């Protein structure tokens, strides 16, 4: 019995147990959100409205993250659409329980998306960038879809 419990909590045969999995998830999420809060403060202070979504796509990456990583650049005005599953010209499935893209923290809003990003255990980062670094074709596309302020 003790061995079964140990395996479930800590892990066995090279697989993490529940305690280890959750500890890693909370640690990864906290560190990345801390970094994201700093990036948001910088972008707010500098008045930057364009962002680049960066990071590695993994087997566990969510559909939202895959699509936004492929899109690469986004404008602050697009965030509201992200929360309803609209990323560029693609539509992402929404969770029935939260009404947000799968994996998103249920408290995600337009105001905190830059910090919470793709949700629990999201390893992607959002970096503010100057308008001049965004390709004109991307700017035109966003202008046509959501308008720019």
Regions found by a protein language model. Name each.
Residues 1-121, 127-149:
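Domain-core detector
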């Amino acid at each position: 019995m003790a061995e079964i419990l140990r395996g479930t909590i800590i892990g066995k045969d090279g697989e993490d147990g529940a305690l280890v999995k959750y500890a890693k998830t909370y640690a990864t999420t906290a560190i990345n959100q801390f970094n994201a809060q700093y990036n948001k403060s910088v972008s707010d202070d500098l008045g930057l409205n364009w962002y680049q979504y960066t990071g590695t796509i993994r087997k566990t990456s969510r559909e939202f993250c895959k699509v936004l990583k492929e899109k690469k650049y986004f404008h602050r005005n697009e965030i509201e659409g992200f929360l309803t599953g609209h990323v560029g010209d693609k539509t992402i499935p929404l969770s029935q329980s939260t009404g947000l893209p799968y994996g998103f923290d249920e408290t995600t809003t337009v105001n905190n998306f830059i910090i919470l990003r793709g949700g629990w255990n999201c390893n992607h980062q959002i970096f503010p960038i100057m308008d001049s670094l965004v390709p004109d074709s991307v700017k035109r596309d966003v202008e046509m879809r959501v308008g720019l302020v």
